[in-house]
Amino acid sequence: MNGALDWTRISDDPNSAAAKAAVREWLAQARRLHLDCDVLGFAETLVRGRRVLDIGVVSHSARYFDQASWRHGRISRAAAYCLGLDILAPLVEELRGRGFNVRCVDATSDAELGERFEIVFAGDVIEHVDNAVALLRFAGRHLAPGGRLYVTTPNPFSRKFFRQFRREGVMVTNLDHVAWISPTMALELGRRAGVQLEAYHLAKPYAGMNRALHRFLWRFSAAEYAFPEFVYEFRGAADILEPSAPSR
């Protein structure tokens, strides 16, 4: 697949049946399933041995810093070099005191870090920010040539949220969230930000016959229903005219 589809080349009408059909077909081809790991395990594979910028390292609270599942801890250990960013200054200072390479920077700003990275990882950040396009622009301009940006965000179509809605009647999620980012929205946000959606990934471990059974069932129903998170993969503006590298 050579980069994202630009629906505006098909029609100037965002409700065009032809444009929607083309986007639907493209997204079906862009979906990647990873059934041997969860999203954090997938992230560790992506960053291993790489120069990495990790955006949103605090994960809301210092109480996560000593947990084995703390994302930045695992990403920074797997990467060859890792710079972490967050806007919560006191917690950034605490992490610096613990020996982490972190800075207090707004990743929706025009700030220039003076470094370029093979991987930029923004884990569960995009649904919090006022300006998702600005976040993608910031991340995109800090990519090295051939680098990739990975953005994780909750999947509103997953059974996790459907079951919660059915159980509670009124859907209440993280109170700091301001958006859900579906695949079509990721495609459009990338177009507006000057980065290009390459693929979207669904990661969750399934073993043995359970994996085979689900692969069979997904022939008849949407796989997205089973996965609580999306991982969007973008490439930077400098690489948009270049041939796509295969997704890892």
For each of these PLM feature ranges, what is it?
Residues E44-R163, W180-G190, F230-A238:
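Conserved SAM-binding loop
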Residues N2-L33, C37, F65, D130-S247:
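S-adenosyl-L-methionine-dependent methyltransferase catalytic module, highlighting the catalytic core
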Residues V92, S247-R248:
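N-terminal amphipathic/basic-hydrophobic helices that include classical n-h-c signal peptides
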Residues L40:
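Aromatic-lined ligand-binding clefts that engage carbohydrates, nucleic acids, or primary amines
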